[in-house]
Amino acid sequence: MQSSWPYLVIGKRSQWGTYGILDNVYNCFKYLAHLKHDWKYYQYMSGSDLPLRTNLEMVRIMKALNGSINSDIEEYEMDRYRTMEGIHPPVPLFKSAMSVSMPRAAANYIVRSQKVKRLLRYLSHTWIPDESFWTSVAGNAPYTPKLVLVTGSICLVLRVPGSYRARDIIWLRKHMNMNPPWEKTTSSVGTTYIGRYQVWEWQKVCGVLDVPDIITRPELIVHKLSLSVEPAAFMCILKEIRYRSHNPIEFDATSYSEMPTVELYSGKRITELTHPEWLLQSSFYRG
């Protein structure tokens, strides 16, 4: 198969919750980072994902991201440490979805970072490490470009291009007296994570009744859909995206440039954010 498609990378067989998933994904990510092709953004998709945006729309959105990393942000769960409990990780850990939008500059840094290699080794002994990697890498930016926090012999930051401070966002969620927005559309994104739309009810497979809501969402892809469970939902969404690809609509990505992580990366302070309330929910919110 690889002789027919030279860019096809085949990983090892892996099981849910184990390091094998992260290992396979990271090896593909590293392969792409070392290519001479001048790609601009990496976007993860699984076999049960479907795009919600056309190529034209994705390009405009990724231009609006302006070099920032887009990953989900949630507190790390203590039961995931397993045998590593009590052993300091190379950087503070955060929980995130596997789906991430990563600029090329960040990819180039990550695959050459010794600290990232140490993080991968650490996570290989933890539970569901694929949901602990991206924001642990992207969410440990220093306060300023010249400041590095050190505790003992442990450096607590990563200078990844496009990164942000996840701990500040988690703190705001706990202390900000605001209501999260109900509207989440391409004209008013309403969230700070667009990597993937997913309903967290025991990994719910989306069906026909979900389609009207899914079509209006601002995310790049939807998870999960299956041709073995209400296949009409899969085909309806696919047909809609194909139609828009051949008949482009007026698409303005301005709202994506107003996402909090994009504005924080561009230099705005927390108090200067256009939509601070967009920080209040992660994709793990059930609602």
Model-found features: residue ranges?
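ER/Golgi luminal nucleotide-sugar-dependent glycosyltransferases, focusing on the catalytic module
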Residues: 1-287
